[in-house]
Amino acid sequence: MDARSDLHHYNPYRVFSRAEWASMREDTPMTLDAAEVAALRSMHDRLDLSEVEEIYLPMSRLLSIHVAAMQQLYYAQRRFLGVVERKMPFIIGVAGSVAVGKSTTARVLQALLARWSPRPTVDLVTTDGFLHPNAVLERAGLMQKKGFPESYDLPALLGFLSDIKSGRRKVKAPIYSHLTYDIVPNKFTVIDRPDILIVEGVNVLQTGRLPRDGKAVPVVSDFFDFSVYLDADEPVLRDWYVRRFLALRDTAFHDPRSYFHRYAVLSDEEATATAIAIWERTNLANLEDNILPTRPRATLILKKGADHVVDSVALRRL
């Protein structure tokens, strides 16, 4: 079967096989070595030099074209308006389901883009930091919907992106701990006018309801100049999630500080059943209701197979 056959519904996209996409790298240099690539890889994600060369280097080349075009537009509009404005950062959104490999993709892009010439400043922020603290979610009865749109402090996230896009100095982003499964009190990442900002999260392409009064209602993706959606079939995502859960049971869950410490003693059978239950109760519902419907809003869609390797790419037509 043609690799693009299951992507026919991605119109208005141009769909490329892996080989076709890889050919668009042209002379883009490889700036990472094997050890650096391994350090960027998340648990159970597959990332090697060939994946970087065939998938991410063409992305890097495409992004360099978009960034250059945006810079030209910025200077042209500045001349048109007759004003001197701060240069706005180029913002890239990375979206997709839990366990699909968003963090790996975001880190690889950050590493590659930071080595462009001249060297731009490239920062990375995850939207996990903009989740409401657990105490707030518990009071609202939303702990079982953590990661759903309603579990985020959307005004804070929109305010952060607005400050970044307007060129403000030293903008703070809250820090989230995957160990404690909660916001770290009084700890922040400081973003100081980067050239490029990568924003990674499950719902970054989420749309809002249309206003009845015609007033503008901003959404996170309004601030993006380019967006990437990591895609995989649901049974594959579930398998990856279960595998990750089992791996964490044997590692991070053994830390007494871990929110999931109680799962460290589960047998393989018990841990698998628990992971599947969490997937079906929370992650599957979020995927079907909130994440997957945003896929057609992405600039670029990377479709992964069961081996974690990208087998086709869909690029939105201009």
Swiss-Prot record:
Pathway: Cofactor biosynthesis; coenzyme A biosynthesis; CoA from (R)-pantothenate: step 1/5. It catalyses: (R)-pantothenate + ATP = (R)-4'-phosphopantothenate + ADP + H(+). ATP binds at residues 96-103. Its main location: cytoplasm. GO terms for biological process: coenzyme A biosynthetic process. It is found in: Cytoplasm. Keywords: ATP-binding, Coenzyme A biosynthesis, Cytoplasm, Kinase, Nucleotide-binding, Transferase. Disulfide bonds: none annotated. Its EC number is 2.7.1.33. CDD domains: PanK (cd02025). GO terms for molecular function: ATP binding; pantothenate kinase activity. Pfam families: PRK. Belongs to the prokaryotic pantothenate kinase family. This is Pantothenate kinase.
